[in-house]
Amino acid sequence: MKALILDAENKTASVQELPLPSPGPNELLIAVKAVALNPVDALYTFNPLGSTGRIVGSDFAGLVVARGPPLPSSGYQNETPSGISSLRRSSTALSASINRGDRVAGFLQGACSVNIRPGAFAEYVVCPSDLVWRIPGTMTFEEAAGVSLCALTAAQGLFFRLGLDAPFQWDVDSEEAVLRRVESEISRDPGDDDELSFFVFGASTSVGMYVAQLVRHSAEMGGKRVKLIGTANPRNWDKLKAKPYAYDHLFDYRDATWPEKVREASEGGVHFAYDAISEALTVRDVSTILREGGKMAVVRSGEAGAWHAEGVRTKPIYGAVWEGLGEDVEYHNMLVSSSPAKRSFATAFYKWLSDGGLLQPNPVRLMPGGLEKIVEDGFALLGTNVTNRDQSRTEDHMKPISGEKLVYKIDTEKGVGSGDGHIA
C-alpha cells in the first residue's frame, strides 16, 4: 500500500510503499477513502517529534475490509455491575456490530509524539473498533473525514474539562469526572440556573464550529438558555449566525476592542470560554472576558510554549485530544498518561455519533490529487511555526483557509478478500 512517511531529518514526508497492516484483537482494517488535514499534522511533519519511517496524519474515513480476532473473554479489569460497566458493554456491543463493508471514520496519532504508532495518511489503516463511528447515509466520506479529531477535541473541552452537561452518557462516576463536577459546583454562578454565556475565540475554526453545535446540544439537554458569543472573520458571520451554530453575537478578532465588546454583550463577562486558537496572546485576552468563577478551555499547551502565560487571569484547562486513544503520549518533554476514563469518554462520544448524534460536518475544500499532494499543497497551505502559510500560490485550491476543512480523496488499489475477513 501507499502511505505518507515522515522524513524527520529533512523535515518533510513522502509517499512510499509499505506492507498491508494486519488488524490485531479488537481492531479493524479499513480501506481509506478520504483524509482530512489538521494543523498538528503539518506542524509535526515540518517540526518532527516522531522518527523517520512513521506514517503521518490523523483523520480518516473509509470502508471496513477486515476484523481482527476478538478480545479475550475476561473483558475489562475491575468490572462491576454499575452504570460504568453497562456503558462499556454498550460501547463494546457497538464495536462488535461493525462489520466488513461498513462506512466508518476515526483518527490516529500519526508522528505527533514520541512513539511508534502509525498515522492515517495511507491507503489502509488499522484502528481499534471502539474508536470509530458509523458514517450516516447523509454524509460523504469527505465530510466524515474531518469530524473525528476536531469534534472530539470540542467535546473533551466542553464536557470532560469544563463540566457542561453532555448529550450522551459516559463514565460519570470515574474519579476524574467526579472531581470535575465538584469543581463546577464550587464555581457555579447563581445566574447559571437561568442562562449561561459561552464565548468561542476562533468560531470559524474546525474545532470552533463543533464547539458551538455541542454547546447548543448541551443547553437543550440541560433545559437552559445559552448566549453564544464568538470572534471570527466577518465574511463567516452569516454562516455562524445561522443554524446549527446560531451565534447571538459575533465580533471581528482583528478589532482590538473585542474583549470590551464581549464583556458588554455578556453583561460583565461570560461563564465559560473556549479558545480554539490558543497561541501567543489569545489565552491572555480570552481570560479577561470571564466573569468571577468563570472557566476556560484551551487547545494547546502553555508548557510547550504555544501561548504566553504573562497576564493570564484565569488558569486555563488543557488536555490533548490524544488522551482519547487510551495510550501514553509523550511530546515536548511531557508525558500525557493513559486514562481509562478519557478513553471511555471517547468511545461514548463516538457511540453517540454512531447512534445519530447530530453534528453538521465542517464545509469541505476538496483538494486536487491524493497522498502525493498533501505536503506540497495541503501542509504548505496550513503552515506551521516553521513554515509560514504560503501566500504566493494563485491556484483556487490554494486560497487562504477560512471556515473550511482541507480534504483529500484516497484511491485504494489493492483488493481484499471476503467471507472470513482475511486479506486476499
Protein language model features and the residues they cover:
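Terminal helix/beta-alpha structural elements that buttress the NAD(P)+-binding lobe
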Residues: 1-24, 31-63, 73-77, 81-93, ...
